[in-house]
Amino acid sequence: MSTSNIVDALIIGGGPAGLSAALAFARQNQSAIVFDSGRYRNAATDYMHLIPGLDHKAPAEFRATARSQITDRYDKIRILEGVDIVAAKKTDADSFELSDEAGQTWNGRKLILATGVEDVMLDIPGYAELWGKSIVHCLYCKGYEQRGGSAGVLAVGPLGNVNMALHIARQETALSKRVTLYSNGNESLAGELVSAFGSATAMRTDARKIKEFVAGADGKGVAIRFEDGSEVVEDYLAHQAPVKAREGLADLLGLEKGPNGEVKVSSPFQQASVRGVFAAGDNGAMLKNVPNAVFSGHVAGQMASTQLLADLNGQKSIFPI
């Protein structure tokens, strides 16, 4: 392989984690290619939060600004939009080769997976349509704008247990006057929740079986329609959908995974189980939000850059990577 055809880093994912990793390489005058499929977990939401200076900005605006800042200022970073990487492997030369859907290949000395995850929608009519709007997965990201009224917790799936359901319900009590935990027909869980309420007076349960979700009046809030024909309206409903990896690249590379399917990384260095592969953002973290994606993306970029510079100089890195 000619060294003229290889870049320092291949970064799969053009969200906050991938862009942050690219910026780390840019600041060390190293070359990188970012492959942006155009699929983003927060595409359904109108605004993102928790980033000082960018609070309540549209996710698309954040990405566009980051892309332009990187490519306008740093000439060794390329961002390829609309490119899906379908294959990845480590070569005999201890570098990495990627292939896209059209069969084009790229080679890089280090590889950063920032592919994110995909939320698996519940099989309840209306759930997918309201996801990211009035059905929210993170109360630090959304919920403040709907504060002051009533809210619900959908206590099914990942939230279908006392510990997780109450964890989310407690967050809602800081935002809403009344919190109802909906167990969707699970009478046993509803009873366990009541027993665990303690001194909480703002919480209650509803075990009725849910038929569908529809948008509230003027598109605000969520109406929960039950199989018995009744209906209630909440300002918003919190739920954490199950997630899955967007691409099977981790399996192709033989990477170890954590209990929830995320790429297993060495903390705090973000290196995966194969040397030279780093993971950042939602696909390698328990806390899946924009601030953590930005942080872990920078760490992955810095550590991959640091490891590469040690390799090129025939030395060991100061870090155990």
Swiss-Prot record:
Name used for this protein in its record: Thioredoxin reductase tcpT
Pathway info? Secondary metabolite biosynthesis
Q: What induces it?
A: Expression is positively regulated by the thioclapurine cluster-specific transcription factor tcpZ.
Q: Report the PANTHER family cross-referenced here.
A: THIOREDOXIN REDUCTASE 1-RELATED-RELATED
Is Oxidoreductase a UniProt keyword of this protein?
Answer: yes
Belongs to which family?
Belongs to the class-II pyridine nucleotide-disulfide oxidoreductase family.
Function field:
Thioredoxin reductase; part of the gene cluster that mediates the biosynthesis of an unusual class of epipolythiodioxopiperazines (ETPs) lacking the reactive thiol group important for toxicity. Firstly, L-tyrosine is prenylated by tcpD, before undergoing condensation with L-glycine in a reaction catalyzed by the NRPS tcpP leading to the diketopiperazine (DKP) backbone. Afterwards the alpha-carbon of tyrosine is oxidized by the cytochrome P450 tcpC to form a hydroxyl group.
Question: From which lineage does this chain's organism come?
Answer: Eukaryota, Fungi, Dikarya, Ascomycota, Pezizomycotina
Kindly report, in one word, the top-level EC class recorded for this enzyme: oxidoreductase
Biological process terms in GO annotation: cellular response to toxic substance
Question: Per the entry, which co-factors are needed?
Answer: FAD
**Cofactor, how bound (note):** Binds 1 FAD per subunit.
Determine the domain of life of the protein's source: Eukaryota
Name the gene behind this protein.
tcpT
Record key words, sorted: Disulfide bond, FAD, Flavoprotein, NADP, Oxidoreductase, Redox-active center
Q: Name one GO molecular function term.
A: oxidoreductase activity
Disulfide topology? 138-141
Q: How does it assemble?
A: Homodimer.
